[in-house]
Amino acid sequence: MMVNIPVIENFLSNSCFLILFLTTVYYWLKIGFGGKSSFSFTGLTGYGSALCCLTLQLILRWVDSGHFPLSNLYESLIFLAWCLLLLYIYIEVSTKTLFLGVLTSPAILCLVAFTDFSLPTELQQSTPLVPALQSNWLVMHVTVMIASYAALLLGCFIAIAYLVLSKFFIKTTFVTAPLSSQNTVLRQESFLEEKQKTDIVFEKNDKNLKFLFFLDNLSYRTIGIGFCFLTLGILSGAIWANETWGNYWSWDPKETWAFITWLTFACYLHSRLVGGWTGSKPALVASFGFLVVWVCYLGVNLLGQGLHSYGFLNV
Amino acid sequence: MQHCVRASAGATAHHAVGTYRCRLPLLAGPCQRTALPWAHTKLPAAHRTRCRVDCRSTQGPAAAPSLSDSDNEPSSTSGWRPPRPPPPPQGPSPLRQLYKRTLKQLSNLKLALAELAVIAALSAVGTVIKQGETYEFYMENYPEEGRKVLGFLTGRIVVALQLDHIYTAEYFLLLLALLGASLTACTITNQWPAVKVARRWRFKGEQASLARLEVASRVPDARLVDVGRVLAAKNYQVFMKDGQLYGFKGLAGKLGPIGVHASMLLCMAGFVTGALGGFTGSVMIPQGSETVVASALRSASPLAWNPGGASAVIRCDDFRIDYREDGSVRQFYSDLTVLDVDGREQSTKTVSVNQPLRFGGVTAYQTDWSMSALKVKVAGSFVAPEDTAFQLPMAALNGGDSKLYATFLPAEDPALAPPGTAPRGVSMLARDLQTVTFYDSKGEFAGVRRLGSGKPIEVEGMTIVAQEVLAATGLELKADPGVPLVYAGFGGLCVTTVVSYLSHSQVWAAQAGSGVIVGGTSNRAKVAFEQELSDMLGEVPEVLQQAPDLVDGNGKADSSNGSSSGGNSSSSSSSGSKDSKEQVL
């Protein structure tokens, strides 16, 4: 039975986009019109089906090309969306919050839209591997790196949300209790030190601050996981390079930017662990880290030269 | 069963004020415990000095602590100071003082963060400015006149600041060395002592200090040994002494960060060894030829020592490219033989891109290839009219990204051509090992032939059959003595990074009357720790005192959770029911 794989792939990518679009709308409506805001079964079903579409698409590409489906930019973007979806589902189930879906579903939707509709068609084709990529290290190194990008991007995104919301909430707090501003500051700090609660409703100021603390903690934990994967990814890349070219570090732009990303998040983690920072200051570092990860992942490939370039933008 | 295990908010209020450094919201100061005779009372000197060193772990509210948690500095707001030690009779020698002061400066966290930031910024500069190009390239791309890049960046500045080879510039290497020094200093001053501290377990006997712990609760009608048993069942290591208990789990999570820094230092040692002691070089070996390895190797520095394999000879028996149907390369294969100085064969291997050849400390990687000669059979050449076999050397043509090699077959004797003019002839170009393209004297395209097809082509009066391209394999030879160290450092880094995410949990308990006060802290996953402690305390069996009139007391206390399942069991005096009640302190 001859299965027309490109047609099926097209169908899968379109349906993935549609499902994510519907899920985004659903989350926004659900938050906008109130209701209990623990995790949403319908929303998770939406995410789960999008995840299934992407999984099928990757498996089909694997069968079609004969090699692990992570050899070009298109496949790595799909894999990034896959990792983000998986990570998000895990977070929503384990922390039982709904609000993150409002933030992350449009982000993942944009990512999938860019991947399927903006990337030139010739980059979407699966091409056979060049000799340098024909190695088992491909599976280990690239999957771990993409997984680390997913965790870091999600963590930084949450940190940016924290910054935006904290500006918004702190204004509200000050407006409602202007005479006791000193107490408000202390109260905010003490709330930040309490353990997280799970209700997220925005009417009460207390709940707002608890939610901010929750965002802060969640971004810290997610970036922590991402940093661990990033370390493993960089090291596996170095060992692979040594096996292939005899040089574990050649200051290639992609390698250098991965190192810069690692240094940025090392600063973030040390400022938290050793310096004891919480709240806005590490969130600012994480927002900067958000840009750094994008430059490392896409900027270098699209603009630069080197061992990792696709170079279809000539600058 | 309802358990209320509440974080001590009382400590929070105390510690919200004050510098961020001394804010220890949720830990008991060690100084509190000196009141009890059987507790460890002596703070070792290292801890006292460490109170003023910045590169130590404080416990932030949402952060993981501390390599040396709960042991160091007194809280600034507790109002209790340890008695100052008497001044030493004689100061340490100036050299030792200098050493200590340098260590303290180097292990400053802000300095370390600044180093990381500057290294990151300089690395980024190196990705924007193309590295390793010629002087003319920078003159051309960063012009002196007209529109300067960024308004001021000219080629001369780029070269003067060594921005064209920034990763080997002295200031960059010095920065890396400084980072290594900071890592070493931090390990010596802070992290190594933490290992020693970790081995000494400290009891907390005073109720107040137990209450001040992150997670604290009182278990009424329980015995310390039962608490210890429950903890041990959950893989805690438990120590008990004189009515006090200390248990910990996951010590690896506390030692993990030390391992991370030590592994990084090992990697750096490997980098330095490789940079100073290595040999590198590349060589093109045509099919059938051989080359002495040592002739291709260049040392990285005068300190390099010769690898054993440098005296070997590599012979390339064959080089072939595996092409796919669409003409792209699937893989390169070289059949290599290693011979020793006397010509005896040592080993043979078919090398391809991800499969290098290792011998005597030298590794040969397949990285490049070229064409060295083209074998043709020509009828009607100026040399002889009948079929003659030629082996024409090929040269690489510059320009474009892909390889292009060409050779030339003169149609007339070059010696007879007028001086200053090129003789007539056929140009033969090849991009890969599959086809050859022919051009005549005027540069017009004459035809394409597949190598090995045997089909002749008529150009410039000659009949040519292109038979075979003799290729040369391009090998990168490397001898890097630092690689074992680097790999060891990498392996350590992989393991210790993962291990650092483990939770190091500690639990203290003390018998207080009929009940037990339990408190604990964890450096990661605090919420999970609270839940775990709560569950564990739920399993502590209830032990009632003997006096029968206490039955009523228990019955009354029972109403707090209303679960007197087996009201009759509560009247027994042995550890009966598995229910447990807890009260919030």
UniProtKB/Swiss-Prot annotation, chain A:
It is a multi-pass membrane protein. InterPro entries: Cyt_c_assembly, Cyt_c_biogenesis_CcsA, Cyt_c_biogenesis_CcsA/CcmC. It is found in: Plastid, Chloroplast thylakoid membrane. The keyword Cytoplasm does not apply. Its main location: plastid. One of its GO terms (biological process) is cytochrome complex assembly. Keywords: Chloroplast, Cytochrome c-type biogenesis, Membrane, Plastid, Thylakoid, Transmembrane, Transmembrane helix. It comes from the Eukaryota. Belongs to the CcmF/CycK/Ccl1/NrfE/CcsA family. May interact with Ccs1. PANTHER family: CYTOCHROME B_B6 PROTEIN-RELATED (PTHR30071:SF1), HEME EXPORTER PROTEIN C (PTHR30071). Required during biogenesis of c-type cytochromes (cytochrome c6 and cytochrome f) at the step of heme attachment. HAMAP family: CytC_CcsA (MF_01391). This is Cytochrome c biogenesis protein CcsA. It comes from Chlorella vulgaris.
